[in-house]
Amino acid sequence: MHNILEEFAIISPNSEEIDVGEPEDIALQNAVLKARDCAKEGDIIIACDTLVACDGKIYGKPYTIESAIDMIKKLSGKWHSVFSGVCVKTPDKEVTFVEESKVKFNDLNEEQIIDYVKKYLPLDKAGSYGIQDGVVVEKYLGDFDNIVGLPVKKLRDVLKEISYVK
């Protein structure tokens, strides 16, 4: 965010996330819920929700080490999609978009998966991994920052459109 905005604050929303529907719709609806939950008079809010989809299943953040291991097992050796829904809420409008990137995991054995989870503790990451760790991902297509969790290039374009950044 520092490469887009000079000043910002991070606020944790209290909104309850939805988890039923198409992955791009879920990510977008959750971003809108987060933005509305955090909105205060006169503020500009940028909210994002990122999730992973593979073989018809949606993977958010794991709640336990065991669920992180299970998620990575299911993604191992496969292509999957990373969807980030973004809502930019200004005092007079909401601008929303969804960014999709594709990721191919390395084919990992159980020992590699357990070692990864123990070393990186990815409990705060959709799909139980961080591409920036450089361990589990074989290749990707699309915006690297989107896979990290915020599609910075598209966000910058939206902020320019609404005359919030130069």
Model-derived regions: residue spans:
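A short beta-strand-loop structural module common to alpha/beta enzyme folds
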Residues: E7-D19
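Anionic-ligand binding patches
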Residues: E22-K166
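N-terminal beta1-alpha1 ligand-phosphate binding loop
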Residues: M1-L5
